Each structure stands twice: as C-alpha cells, then as structure tokens.
C-alpha cells in the first residue's frame, strides 16, 4: 500500500520536478484522504499512507516555494464511486479473528456506506480543477498545504483537530515538565 499511495506519488514527482523547477512555476497536487487525519480500526495502514502523503506535501510547500511551485494534498471525503466495492478495496489476506471485535464495525460501516457516499465525483473534480488553476470560486485564493474536499471531509477533519486539541489540553501539565532546569518558561 505504501508502494502505491506514497512512493508512487513520489516517483511521479521526482520525474516532473526538474522541468517544473526550470520553468519556475507549477502546482503539485498529491492525493491524500480524510483517512490521513485519524487511524481507523481495519484501515490503519491505509490511514498511515495518507497521513504520510499529507506531511510530505507540507514539507514540499516549503521546499518548492523558492521555485515558484505550489503544493497541496487533496484530502477527499467519501465520494460515490466504486472505491468501497469488493474488487477495489484491499482486505487482509490472513485476518486475525481475535481482532474482529475491534474492526467489524468499520468493515460493516464501509459496506453499508458503499454507493451511499455523499460526495458527487463530478462536483469534486470541478472543485479540484478550479483550485489547481485558481479559476472560478478559487480565483485569488492561495492553495493550502492540505485541501479538504467535501462536507464530510471538513466535518471529519474538524473532529480530528478537536480530539487532538483535547488530548494536548488534558496532558499539557504532565508533558511540559521535560525541559532542563536552566530553560526559561
């Protein structure tokens, strides 16, 4: 999964970046997912690949800016495609029955969601084109390092941010005591 979702995108970029740097312009659009914002039981490896792409893209923003090249990681929510259908999803070949209790709700939820996803692929594609070409609704906007795509993506990302903020707040008094004594607060 990392070979396709992460290293595949890196290989394509490695092939086109020399000419983009030479022309001092362009846009890099990597494909992430809302899965890159939280680990989901039964989808941890997929989520990890999408998180890796997002963080890699954030680094690219700084690395490519001196060349006039922008980078963004498009993070779609669920779009009504065959992505969740039998022949398109990766399933563990040697599933561990003892993990079923932790993963069954995810598998059942994704199966029920198949062909009921809220996102319209044509509308999503239009937003992507407008964002990358800075036309239409995206005229005059700067591309963010991570571009959520879809109402469900925005909702899921906000929930992930809130969970992380809550964890920071709850543990701040414990984890901030690690500085050397000669370091000022």
Tell what function each PLM region has:
Residues 33:
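Residue(s) in the substrate-gating loop at a strand-loop-helix junction
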Residues 66-142:
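SDR active-site lid
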């Amino acid at each position: 999964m990392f070979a396709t979702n992460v290293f595949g995108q890196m290989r394509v970029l490695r092939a086109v970046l020399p000419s983009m740097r030479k022309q001092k312009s362009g846009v890099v659009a990597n494909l992430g997912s809302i899965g890159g914002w939280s680990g989901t039981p039964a989808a941890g490896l997929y989520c990890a690949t999408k998180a890796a792409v997002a963080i890699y893209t954030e680094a690219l923003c700084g690395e490519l800016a001196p060349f006039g090249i922008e980078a963004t990681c498009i993070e779609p929510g669920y779009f009504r495609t065959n992505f969740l259908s039998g022949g398109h999803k990766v399933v563990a070949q040697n599933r561990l029955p003892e993990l079923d209790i932790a993963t069954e709700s995810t598998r059942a939820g994704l199966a029920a969601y198949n062909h009921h996803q809220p996102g319209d692929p044509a509308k999503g594609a239009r937003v992507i084109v407008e964002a990358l070409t800075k036309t239409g609704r995206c005229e005059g906007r700067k591309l963010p390092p991570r571009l959520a795509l879809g109402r469900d993506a925005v909702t899921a990302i906000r929930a992930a941010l809130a969970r992380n903020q809550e964890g920071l707040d709850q543990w701040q008094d414990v984890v901030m005591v690690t500085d050397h004594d000669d370091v000022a607060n």
